[in-house]
Amino acid sequence: MDVTRLLLATLLVCLCFFTASSHLAPEEKSKDERSLRSNSSMNLLDFPSVSIVALNKKSKKISRKEAEKRSSKKKASMKKVAQPRPPRPAPCVANRDSCKPPALACCDPCAFCQCRFFRSACSCRVLNPTC
């Protein structure tokens, strides 16, 4: 009985080893060093050289100012026309008041009823201030 357990344990270890090795990525091996050298020299020549230039304080300030101008222009162009908010429902629940499902809707059109603890504690909350 001990021999069969030993045989089964060995078989299990071999299966684990082959399973793990079959999932590993295969390694790429070059056939000769000449192809490796030619590939590395070709790759270096393909890319342009990089030069590093130190910026002084004045150029940093100018670039920061230009960036602020560009961002303000983008914000001005991206602003949408203010859409009118939908009217409030007549009987409604104020923010941070209880709004369990049989209760009425929230007064703020940007608010919604958020429930916690398996819908035992519900309240109207505004999570998107830009609404």
UniProtKB/Swiss-Prot annotation:
<feature type="glycosylation site" description="N-linked (GlcNAc...) asparagine">
    <location>
        <position position="39"/>
    </location>
</feature>
<dbReference type="InterPro" id="IPR036836">
    <property type="entry name" value="Agouti_dom_sf"/>
</dbReference>
<feature type="disulfide bond">
    <location>
        <begin position="110"/>
        <end position="131"/>
    </location>
</feature>
<feature type="disulfide bond">
    <location>
        <begin position="92"/>
        <end position="107"/>
    </location>
</feature>
<dbReference type="GO" id="GO:0031779">
    <property type="term" value="F:melanocortin receptor binding"/>
</dbReference>
<dbReference type="GO" id="GO:0008343">
    <property type="term" value="P:adult feeding behavior"/>
</dbReference>
<dbReference type="InterPro" id="IPR027300">
    <property type="entry name" value="Agouti_dom"/>
</dbReference>
<feature type="region of interest" description="Disordered">
    <location>
        <begin position="58"/>
        <end position="92"/>
    </location>
</feature>
<feature type="signal peptide">
    <location>
        <begin position="1"/>
        <end position="22"/>
    </location>
</feature>
<dbReference type="GO" id="GO:0005184">
    <property type="term" value="F:neuropeptide hormone activity"/>
</dbReference>
<keyword id="KW-0732">Signal</keyword>
<keyword id="KW-1015">Disulfide bond</keyword>
<keyword id="KW-0325">Glycoprotein</keyword>
<dbReference type="GO" id="GO:0009755">
    <property type="term" value="P:hormone-mediated signaling pathway"/>
</dbReference>
<dbReference type="GO" id="GO:0042438">
    <property type="term" value="P:melanin biosynthetic process"/>
</dbReference>
<feature type="domain" description="Agouti">
    <location>
        <begin position="92"/>
        <end position="131"/>
    </location>
</feature>
<dbReference type="GO" id="GO:0048023">
    <property type="term" value="P:positive regulation of melanin biosynthetic process"/>
</dbReference>
<dbReference type="GO" id="GO:0006091">
    <property type="term" value="P:generation of precursor metabolites and energy"/>
</dbReference>
<feature type="disulfide bond">
    <location>
        <begin position="99"/>
        <end position="113"/>
    </location>
</feature>
<keyword id="KW-0964">Secreted</keyword>
<comment type="function">
    <text>Involved in the regulation of melanogenesis. The binding of ASP to MC1R precludes alpha-MSH initiated signaling and thus blocks production of cAMP, leading to a down-regulation of eumelanogenesis (brown/black pigment) and thus increasing synthesis of pheomelanin (yellow/red pigment).</text>
</comment>
<feature type="disulfide bond">
    <location>
        <begin position="106"/>
        <end position="124"/>
    </location>
</feature>
<dbReference type="GO" id="GO:0031782">
    <property type="term" value="F:type 4 melanocortin receptor binding"/>
</dbReference>
<dbReference type="GO" id="GO:0032402">
    <property type="term" value="P:melanosome transport"/>
</dbReference>
<dbReference type="GO" id="GO:0032438">
    <property type="term" value="P:melanosome organization"/>
</dbReference>
<keyword id="KW-0960">Knottin</keyword>
<dbReference type="InterPro" id="IPR007733">
    <property type="entry name" value="Agouti"/>
</dbReference>
<dbReference type="GO" id="GO:0044725">
    <property type="term" value="P:epigenetic programming in the zygotic pronuclei"/>
</dbReference>
<dbReference type="GO" id="GO:0005615">
    <property type="term" value="C:extracellular space"/>
</dbReference>
<protein>
    <recommendedName>
        <fullName>Agouti-signaling protein</fullName>
    </recommendedName>
</protein>
<dbReference type="GO" id="GO:0031781">
    <property type="term" value="F:type 3 melanocortin receptor binding"/>
</dbReference>
<dbReference type="Pfam" id="PF05039">
    <property type="entry name" value="Agouti"/>
</dbReference>
<feature type="disulfide bond">
    <location>
        <begin position="115"/>
        <end position="122"/>
    </location>
</feature>
